[in-house]
Amino acid sequence: MATTGEGQRAMRRARVGVTAAFAAHAMLSGLLGPWIPHIKDQAGLDASGLGIALTGFAVGLLTGTRVADPAIRRWGGRWVVRGGIPVMGVGFALLPAAGGLASLTLLFFGIGLLAGLIDVAMNIEAVAVERRFERRVMSAIHGTWSVALFVGAALASAGIAAGLSIRIHLPISAALVVVVSAAFLRWLPSAGEATEAPVERPDEPRGRPSPTRVLLLLCLVALGSFLVEGIAVEWSAVFLRESVGADPGAAGLGVVAFSAGMAASRFLGDRLVARFGQPVVDRVGASSAFVALAAMLIVHRLVPSVAALGIVGLGLGPVVPLAFRTAGRTFRTGHASALPLVATAGYTGSIVGPLLVGFIADLATLRIAFLVPLVATAVSSLAAGATRDP
């Protein structure tokens, strides 16, 4: 481990570089949400047209995670991030100029592809920093992502409240994110060693799951956790309003509680793992989320339901960062191909989960539909218990 002054400076710079990548990615993503109704109006779309355009983003996101492996092999995670974030910023700046369904869908696809590609690459970089300096930073860096997402959304909301035009605010905001982050992205470490061929360790202790089995379990963990997160963000306000009877203003508190809990636990996640071990943190976190969701479905009151969503966020917050960490270290070299698989499983959950809840709610009730995240947390808990510290 680097202990000299020079080594400590290198570690700090590498961590700042990776953190800047996560922050830029999240702020650009956060800028999008509040402006979507305006983008819809600018393009002259109805609700179904907007749904088609946003499907382009989802398809692009999954495509990006799948093409990440060859891209990182060819250019390295550092250059994928440094080149991808400015191009992603240009994509956001062009959104107000999209003149119809076809152009908007294509643009959303491109932005989604870059978002998925950069997501995998910057997580590879975070794994490289952990391995090189023997410091656990993955969970805290994901905590920064959560905070930056909120900042980006708040910045967009402030622009809307001030009556600024989307043609001015979105391009300028995206440009600021790109320019400011560029000053720190140059500190991204070279993670070329993370692109070597994967080598399974034949001398693992007996009883330890094989890397392939661990990878499958991590995909289940990511699928379940992302699925719950997607449902919490997109459906919790509707659940509190229709199933609990909250007024429209209070219904949004569920998303706030969930997001705050997730960010807080991510900043604590690395310390908790250092003290208790990753399997314990994963298992206790997912189990706590399961109990909280079960209580929310039983108790039909606002305050306990909001508190339950906060506990769900607290429990699941570190789970995905830790899954990415293990995926990056399942193979001796931290080979890139492990992370795209886990990321693809996760994003699939975030897309399928909300759709599944809507479908079941139409057939039965929203309360019954919320059995979906309950089952997902149970699956995540069981899968997390079978993993080991990398």
Which residues make up each language-model segment?
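Short amphipathic helix-loop junctions that connect adjacent transmembrane helices
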Residues: 33-48, 234-250
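Interfacial helix-cap and linker-helix signal at transmembrane-aqueous boundaries
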Residues: 39-40, 71-72, 158-163, 240-241, ...
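Helix-to-loop junctions at the C-terminal end of transmembrane segments
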Residues: 62-77, 160, 265-278, 361-362
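Primarily marks hydrophobic transmembrane alpha-helices of the MFS/SLC 12-helix fold
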Residues: 78-81, 85, 282
